[in-house]
Amino acid sequence: MKAFKQKQVWFITGSQDLYGPKVLEQVAKNSEQIVYGFNESSAISIEVVYKPTVKSPREIHAVCQAANSDENCVGVILWMHTFSPAKMWIAGLNELSKPFMHLHTQFNAELPWSEINMNYMNTHQSAHGCREFGFIGTRMRKERKVVVGHWQSSDVQAQIDDWCRAAAGWHESQNLRIARFGDNMRQVAVTEGDKVAAQIQFGYEVHAYSLGELNEAIAAIAEGDVTAQLDRYASEYQVGNELFGDEYQLDRLRKEAKIELGLTQFLTQGGFGAFTNCFENLTGMTGLPGLATQRLMANGFGYGGEGDWKTAAMVRIMKVMGQGRAGGTSFMEDYTYNFGATDQVLGAHMLEVCPSIAAAKPRLEVHRHTIGVRCDVPRLLFTGKAGPAINVSTIDLGNRFRIILNELDTVTPPQDLPNLPVASALWEPRPNLAVAAAAWIHAGGAHHSAYSQAITTDQIVDFAEMAGAELVIIDADTKIREFKNELRQNSVYYGLARGL
């Protein structure tokens, strides 16, 4: 079973009538076998759909139009089995609005040395057929992924899956609706941004709602549904006897369950995939949602604290991209440092860290929240699972959006954190904290990020290219002087690119 159950990537093979029916029959047969192999492979998480070989400008244009109008098609894979004159592709590529990958492969891995003849050469000529197609893509300035290698190799299939996941994320971005309850935290700069420009570039919509509308949805939740929700909490988390045995704590938990159910209903009925709130805008609420927000993220919703709709969008998009993979994705904040033999970052937030990144079964506890509405708030406590991760931040620079990515190594804390009443993750940024933090600051990266152990750097690279957005990467090879030069060069390129 594929992780993406209703989404598809179309496989389109290019050729021409010049070769005659026998060769074209072989081309079609080989294409069908490749598609079958992809669908049988556990490495590729989305259904690949075979489309008949295209041999003329009219056929190419028609299949590109069909891909555009198919809601389940998130992208297309294009392969030139033989030579397919590239002028035939101009109208179709001009029309194509879905992302496309150029797969530079051939059906047979090895040459049949003792049997090879000109018939074989004319049938299996992607080595130069794909170069012809590559030229027209470059000439038309089409952003695309190029994957090179035999279609059965694990490396090629991993690259295909990365791109397919990015295409699914891009499809989600085009259809995503984000609900904002309240506004940005007052006087904060980086969470601001041009929502119209974001919708033009990324596709997602951001809509504001009053707390009164949300409170109405919460008030409408039946007490019986709240009781059933508490039973779910007891079965899914570590819960001390004192929580359910203490009348006050139980009341706080019931209020939190009611918030979760009301918020879920509001978002679901409105077709929203992500939301934001702000501790400064909680009129009528019993408190800042803690457990409720954590569970909504665990169920796939994106979230951004303090009105941060850009991060909420990225959390949702990355959750979609990571479907079926080990590891989770969460809203996150660089909170405090541990300077020592190896400098580290303790990431957390007031309440809202997703349990999908937890190293062990989370504990459900009630603790005092002292910012905004000061009250006792139920929340899940855990530390993040050790392993590779990334932090991704999207910022608005006024004339463009920039995505900043830092590769991390999450580690197990050397000691317990018995007095910390929030979930957290401890990581070592690559190449080290000194370089990573300086680069992040030079790039203008936010204090919020989308943290993930399910998503790879390559997937974010593919997504950024689909979006036409600037991406800068901080990894083991980053050097500050080179990184600052990259930022300067990007400023020139993206400033000129709009007019080219």
Swiss-Prot record:
Disulfide bonds: none annotated. The keyword RNA-binding does not apply. Its cofactor is Mn(2+). It comes from the Bacteria. One of its GO terms (cellular component) is cytosol. Mn(2+) binds at E306, E333, H349, H448. Belongs to the arabinose isomerase family. Binds 1 Mn(2+) ion per subunit. SUPFAM superfamilies: FucI/AraA C-terminal domain-like, FucI/AraA N-terminal and middle domains. This is L-arabinose isomerase. GO terms for biological process: L-arabinose catabolic process to xylulose 5-phosphate. It is an enzyme of class 5 (isomerase). It catalyses: beta-L-arabinopyranose = L-ribulose. It comes from Shewanella sp. (strain MR-4).
